Amino acid sequence: MIDDDGYRPNVGIVICNRQGEVLWARRYGQHSWQFPQGGINPGETPEQAMYRELFEEVGLNKKDVRILASTRNWLRYKLPKRLVRWDTKPVCIGQKQRWFLLQLMCNEADINMQRSSTPEFDGWRWVSYWYPVRQVVSFKRDVYRRVMKEFAPTVMPVQEAAPPRVPPAYRRKRG
């Protein structure tokens, strides 16, 4: 289902723990990481799609999470030209997304990325709240920044809700 502007309706999911960290998932067989996301099927509401994707990609059910917030508007990103499938009709040039902020209510051991017959992810970890904005693939970065800025007051105290001006350097453990 592609809209008239060439965007595929989609939901994005930010899952946070009680420490304000967020679930960061590694794409299956790749070195890229992102938040869970997926398309909205015909006849589905964004919330219904979110719960379906939550189960398919993370193995969690409605009872395992609590919705804390959702984005007020659709957020869009364009795909790089090399990723656009020009031979399909209609051509999808990007995604328009509604995002949900969820609080994990179950034990993290219940997270199971392998419930689907075609898993999207093969690993996950908890990361600091702003980490994904710096680490996601570049064409999604603006949407991630906007999502995290919108959700920040819900996750953390107001004085900490702005992204850091200069992101801390990433360091690998040596030795």
UniProtKB/Swiss-Prot annotation:
<dbReference type="GO" id="GO:0005737">
    <property type="term" value="C:cytoplasm"/>
</dbReference>
<keyword id="KW-0378">Hydrolase</keyword>
<comment type="similarity">
    <text>Belongs to the Nudix hydrolase family. RppH subfamily.</text>
</comment>
<dbReference type="InterPro" id="IPR000086">
    <property type="entry name" value="NUDIX_hydrolase_dom"/>
</dbReference>
<dbReference type="InterPro" id="IPR020476">
    <property type="entry name" value="Nudix_hydrolase"/>
</dbReference>
<dbReference type="InterPro" id="IPR022927">
    <property type="entry name" value="RppH"/>
</dbReference>
<dbReference type="Pfam" id="PF00293">
    <property type="entry name" value="NUDIX"/>
</dbReference>
<feature type="short sequence motif" description="Nudix box">
    <location>
        <begin position="38"/>
        <end position="59"/>
    </location>
</feature>
<dbReference type="GO" id="GO:0034353">
    <property type="term" value="F:mRNA 5'-diphosphatase activity"/>
</dbReference>
<dbReference type="GO" id="GO:0006402">
    <property type="term" value="P:mRNA catabolic process"/>
</dbReference>
<dbReference type="InterPro" id="IPR020084">
    <property type="entry name" value="NUDIX_hydrolase_CS"/>
</dbReference>
<feature type="domain" description="Nudix hydrolase">
    <location>
        <begin position="6"/>
        <end position="149"/>
    </location>
</feature>
<protein>
    <recommendedName>
        <fullName>RNA pyrophosphohydrolase</fullName>
        <ecNumber>3.6.1.-</ecNumber>
    </recommendedName>
</protein>
<comment type="function">
    <text>Accelerates the degradation of transcripts by removing pyrophosphate from the 5'-end of triphosphorylated RNA, leading to a more labile monophosphorylated state that can stimulate subsequent ribonuclease cleavage.</text>
</comment>
<dbReference type="InterPro" id="IPR015797">
    <property type="entry name" value="NUDIX_hydrolase-like_dom_sf"/>
</dbReference>
